[in-house]
A protein has these predicted regions:
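Residue patterns forming the tRNA-binding/recognition surfaces of aminoacyl-tRNA synthetases
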Residues: 1-5, 45, 55-57, 70-173
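Protease-associated
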Residues: 2-74, 83-87
Length: 173
């Protein structure tokens, strides 16, 4: 996959988008100029800053479940909460399973204190105890907007497991 570095009139800094997604995202990006391109493999190992806790740096990793079929061609990774993310995490460092796997959701589907390791202490205060599928999701959206990291809110239909008896979502822990 090839990625474009774009400067958008309505967004600060550089935005990275899969080249094949630029046309599909034109309405969201607004007027933009491509200022560079790179292969996805060249991004591997580089780091990005969390929009919540800028002192936290995370590695860019590659995974074959990221495609140009939808979105930007970039996704976040939550290895404690899904098979694709878990496999990408293990491929990054097979020995890191015990020491690096962070689960910030409890058995009731609510954010725990461990969320601070992902979003920082300030944002964690607003998230701890919130249901991840309801109030927690709304709070994450609010927090992203507050730090200028939210470009668009849109409902996306995801394949997601539901318990056949209760109709409730199944959260992988």
């Amino acid at each position: 996959m090839t990625y474009s570095f774009v400067v958008c009139e309505n967004l600060p800094g550089l935005t990275i988008v899969a080249e094949e997604r630029l046309d599909a995202l034109a309405d969201i990006l607004g007027q933009y100029t491509v200022v560079g391109k790179t292969r996805g493999s060249d991004l591997a190992g580089s780091q990005y800053r969390s929009p919540f806790a800028v002192e936290v740096r995370r590695p860019v990793i590659l995974s074959n479940h990221v495609t140009v079929e939808s979105g930007t061609g970039l996704v976040h990774c939550a290895p404690a909460h899904g098979a694709e993310d878990y496999n990408a995490f293990l491929a990054l460092d097979p020995g890191s399973f015990r020491s690096g796997l962070l689960c910030h959701v409890d058995g009731e589907g609510k954010f725990t204190d461990d969320i601070a390791e992902v979003v920082g202490d300030s944002a964690a205060k607003e998230l701890v105890g919130q249901d991840i599928m309801e109030a927690g999701s709304r709070t994450v959206t609010k927090l992203l907007k507050a730090v200028g990291a939210l470009v668009k809110v849109q409902r996306i239909r995801h394949r997601y497991p539901y318990d056949w008896k209760t109709g409730e979502p199944v959260i992988t822990l």
